[in-house]
């Protein structure tokens, strides 16, 4: 039977304490934000709120959800995240499947792989990208937020390395049963690669949900902005024109901002626990080459 040595136990205790401290440091700002959003106007403006609400009220959340532009931005972000993640998983997994084959199966594979890798080092630039979106007529279109980042080379490489770990005998068995590449991809590769796919889904979801710069460039009008871009105009630029002046006069801007930030962070916080069990496994296996 394996017995843990004293140095190992001390090291483990130290690690647990360190991770606990880091976790608390990460959670405290979010918890403080929640307390500010649930506090009354006067103590929030005076900076008296720490880790317990003063004058408990949910008025900031009521006014936030009464704001039509905020709800429109929230819906745009939901659509962008759902459709953008689904399309990215489809495109990147198909590309990774093709690139995981050797040159005997996919001629020119190395050339295509280098073509993808070069895009990680050099981008097309902001102005050419805007001109392209403009010429395609995608300004104020949801596709303008999805298509430019649809192909993520890092995710393709992660999946490619994962696909290479799939035993070739499984694929050969499906071919002997009369299946083609697409059938093999659906029935063999996708189920086995669930940890890597879940990891990429999490990366893509977080990227779409938190992206704000492209919304400011490609979307015109506050009613067309995704949530991150909408909050950027309010929090960073101080633009509160989307709110009723009476709301601004009677409610602290600090509590309003805190409620919006917390609402914006909540969806990812709720999704992550369901995907985190795949996260480490997907990264480790996808990063290893044979």
Explain the meaning of each model-derived region.
Residues 2-290:
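A hydrophobic, multi-pass inner-membrane permease signature
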């Amino acid at each position: 039977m394996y017995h843990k040595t004293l140095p190992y136990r001390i090291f483990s205790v130290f690690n647990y304490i360190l991770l606990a401290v880091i976790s608390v440091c990460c959670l405290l700002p979010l918890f403080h934000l929640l307390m500010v959003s649930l506090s009354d106007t006067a103590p929030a403006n005076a900076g008296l709120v720490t880790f317990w609400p003063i004058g408990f009220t949910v008025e900031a959340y009521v006014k936030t959800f009464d704001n039509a532009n905020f709800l429109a931005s929230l819906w745009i972000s939901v659509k962008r995240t759902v459709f953008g993640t689904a399309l990215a998983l489809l495109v990147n997994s198909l590309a990774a499947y093709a690139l995981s084959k050797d040159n005997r199966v996919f001629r020119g594979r190395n050339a295509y792989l280098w073509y993808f890798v070069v895009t990680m080092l050099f981008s097309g630039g902001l102005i050419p990208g805007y001109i392209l979106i403009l010429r395609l007529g995608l300004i104020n279109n949801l596709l303008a937020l999805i298509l430019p980042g649809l192909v993520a080379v890092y995710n393709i490489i992660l999946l490619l390395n994962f696909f290479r770990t799939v035993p070739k005998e499984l694929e050969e068995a499906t071919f002997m049963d009369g299946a083609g590449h697409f059938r093999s991809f659906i029935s063999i590769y996708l189920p086995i690669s669930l940890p890597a796919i879940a990891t990429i889904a999490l990366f893509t979801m977080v990227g779409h949900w938190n992206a704000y710069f492209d919304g400011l460039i490609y979307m015109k009008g506050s009613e067309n902005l995704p949530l991150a871009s909408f909050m950027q105009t309010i929090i960073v630029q101080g633009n509160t024109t989307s709110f009723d002046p009476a709301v601004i006069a009677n409610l602290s801007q600090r509590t309003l901002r805190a409620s919006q930030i917390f609402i914006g962070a909540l969806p990812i916080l709720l999704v992550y626990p369901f995907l985190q069990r795949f996260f480490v496994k997907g990264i480790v296996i996808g990063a290893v080459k044979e």
